[in-house]
Amino acid sequence: MLRFVLVYIPVSVVSHTLCISLFIICSTRHTCFSKRYTCLLNICFCFFISSRIRNYF
């Protein structure tokens, strides 16, 4: 339980914050379609990694 609190919560918060900030940067910047598409893929990958981290603990 202690490991869960000390590791899972900070990692989860950091990873989701990174994902959300990445999403905000992508949606606000005027990028061409291909860059935006890559950005969306990165966001999906980011959430996938964060969910995998959650499953690990």
Swiss-Prot record:
Record key words, sorted: Antimicrobial, Disulfide bond, Fungicide, Plant defense
Disulfide bonds: 19-39, 26-44, 32-46
Keyword Disulfide bond: yes
Highest taxon of source: Eukaryota
Signal sequence segment: none
A GO biological process held by the record: defense response to fungus
Family per similarity comment: Belongs to the DEFL family.
The name this protein goes by in its record: Defensin-like protein 302
Organism the protein comes from: Arabidopsis thaliana (Mouse-ear cress)
